[in-house]
Amino acid sequence: MSKLSDIRREYSLGDLHRDALPDEPMSLFSKWMEEARDSELLSDPTAMSIATVDESGQPFQRIVLLKRFSEEGFVFFTNLESRKSQQIAHNAKVSLLFPWHSLERQVAITGEAEALSTADVMKYFITRPKESQIAAWVSQQSSKISARQVLETKYAEMKAKFSKGEVPLPKFWGGYLVKPSSIEFWQGGERRLHDRFLYDKGQSGWDISRLAP
């Protein structure tokens, strides 16, 4: 087996030019997301890492799924009693990362997370499969449990409880809109001369800068 330090690869799938960039970053993100979804190389194109910090400044990361995006920002849903939600309540500044390795691309976002309204959350919740709706009631996310059987038992209880009719929205389940202050697009380049462009949100629009790799 080779050493990790011996692993090499070339990046040659594409490039990124300043004169081809739109004025608004979400236009480029939409294009890249569409290409990621159409690619057979990515199994979870909507998977993104979200980083938060606790009260001591310790950062944490985890993977969540992007459920929609617009000029306003990026939306995901989660348990409101989870560690990430508690940290967002303390410090709303977060960062997101879409690691589209097989396309030799990544998108890094900084911004602030804003809680969605109950109506907005409900609109999404009712579209989820019933099994997923029930699962939202089962897990006290980030709490310590003795065994997986604890979850299985609770799921069976909730499944029986909600066997008839609709599953109500848990009060502890919600979502966030991450309003971006910066969005960086990275495209792998030959000889490690990668293309990086940073969109910084200003008072009159977005400023675009090329960054050294």
From Swiss-Prot:
Its cofactor is FMN. Keywords: Flavoprotein, FMN, Oxidoreductase, Pyridoxine biosynthesis. InterPro entries: Pyridox_Oxase, Pyridox_Oxase_CS, Pyridox_Oxase_N, Pyridoxamine_oxidase_dimer_C, Split_barrel_FMN-bd. Its EC number is 1.4.3.5. Gene3D superfamilies: Electron Transport, Fmn-binding Protein, Chain A (2.30.110.10). Binds 1 FMN per subunit. PROSITE patterns: PYRIDOX_OXIDASE (PS01064). It catalyses: pyridoxamine 5'-phosphate + O2 + H2O = pyridoxal 5'-phosphate + H2O2 + NH4(+); pyridoxine 5'-phosphate + O2 = pyridoxal 5'-phosphate + H2O2. Substrate binds at R8, R9, E10, Y11, K67, Y124, R128, S132, R192, L193, H194. Belongs to the pyridoxamine 5'-phosphate oxidase family. Homodimer. This is Pyridoxine/pyridoxamine 5'-phosphate oxidase. It comes from Shewanella woodyi (strain ATCC 51908 / MS32).
